[in-house]
């Protein structure tokens, strides 16, 4: 790299890596190798590997700046990036070299990798999708960066105590984060509260409280390329230090009160919003992210171009869900108040810059903020939102002069339930593109949630089906299957997943079938070891591993899975000597800390597991395990081991899902409803290679319209009746027999909102087909191979190419 001085680039030989790791341990960490612990060796290794990426990173950044390319800025409240060391080694192609270097130093790479804390910067699919997208942006050499919050405590650590979820703080920074660079000089003031002072036609936002946002950068390496990108995370810092006067008077709590209040903004991911103060903190958190980010984007732009007149040509800002939608009024505010744009001019630029991904159609999950709260915390932004709404409704009224209902339905301000700002509405009105994340979801989005907007802005809406990065989810997570693929179709599938289709030519070869089966068994043994170590439950790796791992939520219907587990238990109890296909039902996932019903479902799973796993009649025929503290790194162990992937959400509720893709990519067969991306997976793998059951989205709606009566299903279906009665009468919790009465009531007497009982029989019958097929291992593996071969479409590389072409209008950087 050109520099005004000479320097030696770090080299990649085993010998150089050994020197580098030892040097970092002694001179960066300041530790004697004789007494260094695993964490210190891990950090030394991370520093040594980071050094080998920095040059690429600086070169990429310099190329983006010198070529003056249009850049995308991807805003997300969550980034679940997973462990960084193993991914970096894979990207650089030095996995074996580092392993050998550490071996020669008497250290084990796998042990060090397991020491790394997962950065807990997300909750579920939203954050993992954002991380896959950053990986693909870098691998494709596209100019972009992610922006998020550097939470001190990530999604809580989940412990299971007496069957119940217990949350404890997840201090992922406990041993530092060598992967990041703190940018002491990149800091912005973020303001809250205050009032608006009118000066003629101009508004001034005055008397505000201020906190500082300080930048921390992480390198996002592209795979097998010099291209890298940046994830910039903001940490909150008090604008004034402690109150020394109060401290010296001995009032220590008061001395640090303001500082703590300021820094709470980046303390925890998604503070519990069941209280007013919790909701207010969440709003502050969202604004903290967007204010620092938009200021940074404008600062970077001006440094490069010395003008804001070409802003719309050079930047694209993408909103991952509604959490960062406040960046719309923030950009307007900065352009008008700080950079002297006229309102119309600022609005035109804003409309050209923003695009938005919708991730849910469920009304309870769509963000709205009370006008009163927004007015108190962000008065200037509320004023701008009112102005945007006024402008939009006036334009609409000219086109539809007598349609008051339409104006009411499309107004950004919802007047019907206590005056609330609808964030999704704001995003749709201003963004130049709005996308859904699967064909079904995008169709439902324009037919239901945004039907009025789709009629007003027909060219605004499009579909971009989600994808996953094959680097982390196949190459890294499943080395044994990757080896089989490399041997038969070559190695370049890592950057062109469509090449998996070449596996079709090998499907009828017994040796390949055997190799794929052997790889699966190796992965199942690895997971069985984890289960034995963590839960003290011994499972048979040759049993069918039936897996549902995702956030615990009623719409994802873990409850229906449990009903099938109990049905299976009852059948085995009735005839213990029959030839049952042995199964291990594996659950993992966190319930939001304030979500009573989801936590109740976790408790039920563990109660059921306790009874089944200790029943001598059952033995190895059925085991149930709930693996606590689900994370990216745990998923990388569970997914390759799955035989059956449970994707059983009520049709029309899951926008896309990405675990469905990860499982199929790793050779699991899917049992699922026609929901989210399952629909497109069915089209790609063929209906004979996937287990589909249950009502379609149209049938779900039709059932609602007719008046769904869950009690009828309960009364007509003997097995269902037995299962629900057992749960209600305390068979699985005799010490507290009434524990799940409310849960059973919600299904039978209170509407069964997610239609578990309506799909139960279809689901159980479909599970019988799964058993029948599993008794023919070659045929099962043939279908698994067809799934793998047809997963090429579901790469996040394809997804990002579609975003780049149809939404962001960005092109790769020349390196």
Residues covered by each model-derived region:
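A conserved ligand/cofactor-binding region detector
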Residues: 1-815
């Amino acid at each position: 790299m050109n520099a005004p001085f000479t320097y030696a680039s770090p080299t990649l030989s085993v010998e150089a890596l050994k020197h580098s790791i030892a040097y970092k341990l002694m001179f960066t960490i300041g530790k004697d190798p004789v007494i260094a612990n695993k964490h210190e060796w891990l950090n030394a290794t991370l520093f040594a590997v980071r050094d080998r990426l920095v040059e690429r990173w600086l070169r990429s950044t310099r190329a983006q700046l010198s070529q003056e390319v249009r850049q995308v800025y991807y805003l997300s409240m969550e980034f679940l990036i997973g462990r960084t060391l193993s991914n970096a080694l894979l990207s650089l192609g030095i996995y074996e070299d580092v392993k050998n270097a550490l071996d020669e130093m008497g250290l084990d790479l796998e042990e060090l990798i397991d020491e790394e804390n997962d950065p807990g910067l997300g909750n579920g699919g939203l954050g993992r999708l954002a991380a896959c997208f950053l990986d693909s942006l870098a691998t494709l050499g596209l100019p972009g960066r992610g922006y998020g919050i550097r939470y001190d405590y990530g999604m809580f650590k989940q412990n299971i105590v007496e069957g119940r979820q217990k949350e404890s703080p997840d201090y992922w920074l406990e041993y530092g984060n060598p992967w990041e660079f703190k940018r002491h000089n990149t800091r912005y003031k973020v303001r809250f509260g205050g009032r608006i002072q009118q000066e003629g036609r101009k508004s001034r936002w005055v008397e505000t409280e201020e906190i500082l946002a300080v930048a921390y950068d992480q390198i996002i390496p592209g795979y097998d390329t010099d291209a890298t990108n940046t994830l910039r995370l903001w940490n909150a810092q008090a604008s004034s230090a402690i109150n020394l006067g109060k401290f010296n008077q001995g009032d220590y709590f008061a001395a640090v009160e303001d500082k703590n209040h300021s820094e709470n903004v980046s303390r925890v991911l998604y503070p519990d919003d069941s209280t007013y103060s919790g909701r207010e903190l969440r709003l502050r958190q969202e604004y903290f992210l967007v204010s620092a980010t938009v200021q940074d984007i404008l600062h970077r732009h001006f440094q490069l171009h010395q003008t804001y007149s070409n802003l719309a040509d050079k930047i694209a800002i993408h909103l991952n869900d509604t959490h960062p939608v406040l960046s719309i009024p923030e950009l307007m505010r900065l352009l008008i108040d700080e950079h002297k744009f006229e309102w119309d001019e600022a609005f035109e630029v804003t409309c050209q810059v923003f695009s938005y991904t919708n991730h849910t159609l469920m009304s309870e999950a769509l963000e709205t903020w009370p006008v009163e709260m927004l007015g108190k915390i962000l008065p200037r932004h509320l004023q701008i939102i009112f102005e945007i709404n006024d402008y939009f409704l006036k334009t609409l009224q000219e086109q539809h002069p007598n349609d008051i209902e339409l104006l009411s339905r499309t107004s950004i301000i919802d007047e019907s339930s206590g005056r609330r700002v609808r964030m999704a509405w704001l995003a749709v009105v201003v963004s130049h593109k709005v996308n859904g994340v699967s064909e079904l979801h995008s169709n439902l989005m324009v037919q239901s949630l945004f039907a009025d907007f789709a009629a007003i802005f027909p060219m605004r809406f499009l579909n971009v089906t989600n994808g996953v990065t094959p680097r982390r989810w196949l190459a890294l997570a499943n080395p044994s299957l990757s080896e089989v693929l490399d041997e038969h179709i070559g190695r370049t599938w890592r950057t062109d997943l469509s090449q998996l289709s070449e596996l079709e030519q090998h499907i009828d070869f017994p040796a390949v079938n055997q190799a794929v089966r052997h790889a699966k068994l190796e992965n199942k043994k690895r997971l069985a070891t984890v289960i034995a170590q963590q839960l003290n439950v011994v499972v048979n790796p040759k049993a069918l591993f039936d897996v549902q791992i995702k956030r615990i939520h009623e719409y994802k219907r873990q409850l229906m899975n449990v009903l099938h587990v109990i049905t299976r238990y009852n059948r085995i109890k009735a005839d213990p000597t029959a030839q049952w296909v042995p199964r291990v039902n594996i659950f993992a996932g966190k319930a939001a800390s304030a979500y009573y019903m989801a936590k109740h479902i976790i408790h039920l799973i563990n109660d059921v597991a306790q009874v089944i796993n200790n029943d001598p009649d059952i033995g190895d025929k059925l085991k149930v395990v709930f693996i606590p503290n689900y994370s990216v790194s745990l998923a990388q162990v569970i997914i390759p081991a799955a035989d059956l992937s449970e994707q059983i959400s009520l049709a029309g509720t899951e926008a896309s899902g990405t675990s469905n893709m990860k499982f199929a990519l790793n050779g699991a067969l899917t049992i699922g409803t026609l929901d989210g991306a399952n629909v497109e997976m069915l089209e790609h793998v063929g209906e004979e290679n996937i287990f589909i059951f249950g009502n379609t989205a149209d049938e779900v709606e039709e059932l609602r319209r007719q008046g769904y009566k869950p009690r009828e299903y309960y009364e007509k279906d003997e097995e269902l009746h037995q299962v629900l009665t057992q749960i209600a009468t305390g068979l699985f919790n005799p010490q507290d027999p009434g524990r799940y009465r409310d849960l059973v009531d919600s299904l039978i007497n209170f509407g069964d909102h997610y239609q578990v009982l309506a799909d139960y029989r279809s689901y159980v019958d479909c599970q019988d087909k799964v058993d029948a097929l599993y008794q023919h291992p070659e045929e099962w593996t043939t279908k698994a191979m067809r799934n793998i071969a047809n997963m090429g479409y579901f790469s996040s590389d394809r997804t990002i190419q579609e975003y780049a072409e149809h939404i962001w209008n960005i092109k790769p950087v020349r390196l």
